[in-house]
Amino acid sequence: MPRFCNSRSGALLLALLLQTSIDVWSWCLESSQCQDLTTESNLLACIRACRLDLSAETPVFPGNGDEQPLTENPRKYVMGHFRWDRFGPRNSSSAGGSAQRRAEEETAGGDGRPEPSPREGKRSYSMEHFRWGKPVGKKRRPVKVYPNVAENESAEAFPLEFKRELEGEQPDGLEQVLEPDTEKADGPYRVEHFRWGNPPKDKRYGGFMTSEKSQTPLVTLFKNAIIKNVHKKGQ
């Protein structure tokens, strides 16, 4: 345990030390310079040692906010643990590197045979795992269909007589479809090729209100039902 002095200056120095946190106070007392605090000189030496250690522990940020010289090179402090936040080569080094490259190119070009770059030797990257990225040599060619071949085959299969008969005949359904188109060109357009375009009259409204004949059975049913109800109430 350190020994403390009883003088007024010693008390003031201890009060200054107590302004710091408890952890710093305990750490300062454990140092070798703060073991004997009976004299003022020892107290001053202890305070100086604690201040030096505290200033060494505090982080130094780039900038002249405290009017102190920077201890680190500001080029190193820009999140150097990331690849994209590092500074590039300096102008002097880049200029020197470019000059060396030019000199090497001139010496290589003096022989008249420029050295092929490694990229020229390699095959250009083509996305062969995609259909549209395959090179020209492996391009899929579309299958060509020749209509003349089909006509020749059909001509061989059917003789001339059957072929003339097929050309002269036309299906009945085709004539029925073509005639209404010419007749109803001026009239309103009806969607007759769908089921719901023009339903037959006997199936409109569920088949109940198509004609007077279809209404009579429904009226008789209502009459019979009313008569039965009247007889039941009379009994």
Curated annotation (Swiss-Prot):
Valine amide, modified sites: V136
Region annotated Disordered, chain positions: 88-128, 169-209
Residue numbers carrying N-acetylserine: S124
One BP annotation, GO: signal transduction
Glycosylation, residue list: N152
Basic and acidic residues: bias regions: 112-128, 181-205
Segment forming the signal sequence: 1-26
Tissue expression remark: ACTH and MSH are produced by the pituitary gland.
Subcellular compartments: Secreted
PTMs per UniProt: Specific enzymatic cleavages at paired basic residues yield the different active peptides.
GO terms for cellular component: cytoplasm; extracellular region; extracellular space; neuronal cell body; peroxisomal matrix; secretory granule
Record PTM Phenylalanine amide, positions in chain: F87
SMART domains attached to this UniProt entry: ACTH_domain, NPP, Op_neuropeptide
GO MF, one annotated term: hormone activity
Key words, A-Z: Acetylation, Amidation, Cleavage on pair of basic residues, Endorphin, Glycoprotein, Hormone, Phosphoprotein, Secreted, Signal
Sites of Phosphoserine modification: S154
Assigned protein family: Belongs to the POMC family.
Protein name: Pro-opiomelanocortin
UniProt organism field: Rattus norvegicus (Rat)
